């Protein structure tokens, strides 16, 4: 039996916290209807599918690379690390790994990167959904801790509202200080110049 593992991440483009990645091996005997790129699904639909995936998948794992690892390694290498952890965290070993995107983590299993794989390969779609639901849950927890930033709405991505909150309050402890917009804000505060947020 060929055990195909799908892998995807979320949080690369955010400017807060770490990277979430998921690996998932679906059970061919229990196909799950409605799997597709998590970004094309409503939050409620993602949550419903995530529960179904957890119930019927042969194996799944959600892993992270921490904020500190993103800062130390850079977002690209932290993403690959989170993916590697997710694959290695599976309770059964896959025969083949399919990763959304163009870069592959270092694993000792045959692997293939597929652009837009989260819309093409059901196991990648499932991984995409699991990672997204896990990260969104963490964003709600961060919102409880730092409500002034609105993490519950923009999920840490640099929207206009997020920029305005950063201008008003400065970065929180979970903002990625190595990211250019955050770094420039910190430099700007030192110089009392924050024109980039005007």
From Swiss-Prot:
Provide the primary localization: cytoplasm
| MF terms in GO | manganese ion binding; RNA binding; RNA-DNA hybrid ribonuclease activity
Q: Where does a divalent metal cation bind?
A: 8-9, 100
The reactions it catalyses are: Endonucleolytic cleavage to 5'-phosphomonoester
Q: Which keywords belong to this entry? A: Cytoplasm, Endonuclease, Hydrolase, Manganese, Metal-binding, Nuclease
Example GO BP: DNA replication, removal of RNA primer
What is this enzyme's EC? 3.1.26.4
Q: How is the cofactor bound?
A: Manganese or magnesium. Binds 1 divalent metal ion per monomer in the absence of substrate. May bind a second metal ion after substrate binding.
User: Domain RNase H type-2 spans what residues?
Assistant: 2-191
Q: Name one Pfam family in it.
A: RNase_HII
Cysteine disulfide partners in this protein: none
Give the record's family classification.
Answer: Belongs to the RNase HII family.
Query: What job does the chain carry out?
Result: Endonuclease that specifically degrades the RNA of RNA-DNA hybrids.
Q: What is this protein called?
A: Ribonuclease HII
Organism whose genome encodes this protein: Desulforamulus reducens (strain ATCC BAA-1160 / DSM 100696 / MI-1)
GN (gene name): rnhB
